[in-house]
């Protein structure tokens, strides 16, 4: 107690001995620092709003002339299919790359029917197999085309949220092989031509799972975090060549991967989401602190801003809340599986 009293007396004496002028200077400095912090945060938010709702992105035509090609991986369903359709509408020829040949043929016919002036090519390859022969075929196709746009959409997630210790090895391997290695290998085949032509656009589908550590989707979350770092690094490397690289940060979208069918303010359908991506190229949207990245869909952008600029993404509270949400999803998925199993047994 005497120790505390002694030091409080010293503090009191220091305060009393501090000259009034210095007190004013100190208070002014604190006020200025606080005001600067508040103003900077406000300006960031204004920038986010302008990026999401007002300012246009780069025109797609700036990446290549009419009749140049767009390569879309994971093209047969969902986002990939919608990217292909909207790029075809913008007069790009389309190289469709995905696993199922019949789905690719169906989409190819749909594109040429809707847009008669657009050419299509298809390549059926399973990115999970990581076969050199498939990438050799892709290289042969790419080398003979003027590829202006690459959409790295191919991806895989867990069948349901699962603790890492219980994740099947084949599922874990497929996620890393498809999301990471497949994206890298496809990009490495396309980029040299873009560098030679001094133009191009490389879009890679990211995820909030790459921003937020996601318990029970640990491997998927890690793969998307890898893509975030890789794409940002690639963006800096290719910018001097006139190539725009952008990782698209997305929350939930109605798709086969998300297993969500109903849209809402925070869960758009593929058409709305892809439109926001293609009309906001070069704008960060809700991700002002991430170079060469964007959260272009308005509600996703506001969520990304709040997470990255207000709450932070790596804190224990945020991670715990994310864990709780996915534990709940897992419980519902397991109950649904049990009900379906019961129906089959009867």
From Swiss-Prot:
Q: Which residues form the active site?
A: 220, 224
Q: What residue stretch is flagged as signal peptide? A: none
Supply the name of the protein: Very-long-chain 3-oxoacyl-CoA reductase
- Kindly list the GO CC terms recorded for this protein: endoplasmic reticulum membrane
Q: What class of enzyme is it?
A: oxidoreductase
Q: Whose protein is this, by species? A: Aspergillus niger (strain ATCC MYA-4892 / CBS 513.88 / FGSC A1513)
Q: Which reaction does it catalyse?
A: a very-long-chain (3R)-3-hydroxyacyl-CoA + NADP(+) = a very-long-chain 3-oxoacyl-CoA + NADPH + H(+)
Q: Which UniProt keywords apply?
A: Endoplasmic reticulum, Fatty acid biosynthesis, Fatty acid metabolism, Lipid biosynthesis, Lipid metabolism, Membrane, NADP, Oxidoreductase, Transmembrane, Transmembrane helix
Read off the SUPFAM superfamilies from this record: NAD(P)-binding Rossmann-fold domains
Report the main location listed first in the record: endoplasmic reticulum
């Amino acid at each position: 107690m005497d120790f505390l009293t002694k030091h409080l007396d010293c503090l009191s004496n220091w305060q009393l001995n501090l000259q009034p002028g210095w007190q004013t200077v100190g208070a002014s400095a604190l006020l200025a620092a606080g005001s600067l912090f508040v103003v900077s945060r406000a300006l960031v938010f204004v920038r986010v709003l302008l990026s999401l709702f007002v300012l246009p992105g780069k025109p797609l035509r700036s990446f290549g002339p009419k009749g140049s090609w767009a390569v879309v991986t994971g093209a047969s369903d969902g986002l990939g299919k919608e990217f292909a359709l909207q790029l075809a509408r913008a007069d790009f020829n389309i190289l469709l790359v995905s696993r199922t040949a019949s789905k690719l043929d169906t989409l190819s016919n749909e594109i040429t029917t809707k847009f008669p002036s657009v050419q299509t090519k298809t390549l059926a390859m399973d990115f999970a197999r990581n076969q050199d022969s498939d990438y050799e075929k892709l290289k042969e196709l790419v080398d003979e085309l003027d590829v202006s746009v690459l959409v790295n959409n191919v991806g895989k997630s867990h069948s349901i949220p699962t603790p890492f210790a219980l994740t099947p090895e084949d599922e874990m391997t497929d996620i890393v092989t498809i999301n990471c290695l497949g994206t890298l290998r496809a990009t490495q085949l396309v980029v040299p031509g873009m560098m030679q032509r001094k133009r191009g656009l490389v879009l890679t589908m990211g995820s909030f799972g790459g921003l937020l550590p996601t318990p029970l989707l640990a491997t998927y979350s890690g793969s998307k975090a890898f893509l975030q770092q890789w794409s940002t690094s690639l963006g800096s490397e290719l910018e001097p060549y006139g190539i725009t690289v952008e990782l698209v940060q997305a929350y939930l979208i109605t798709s086969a991967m998300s297993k969500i069918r109903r849209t809402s303010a925070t869960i758009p359908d593929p058409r709305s989401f892809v439109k926001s991506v293609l009309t906001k190229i070069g704008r960060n949207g809700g991700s002002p602190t991430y170079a060469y990245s964007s959260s272009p869909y308005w509600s996703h952008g506001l969520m990304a801003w709040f997470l990255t600029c207000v709450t932070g993404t790596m804190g224990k509270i945020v991670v715990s809340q994310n864990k709780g949400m996915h534990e709940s999803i897992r419980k519902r998925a397991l109950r649904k599986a049990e009900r379906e199993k019961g129906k089959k047994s009867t």
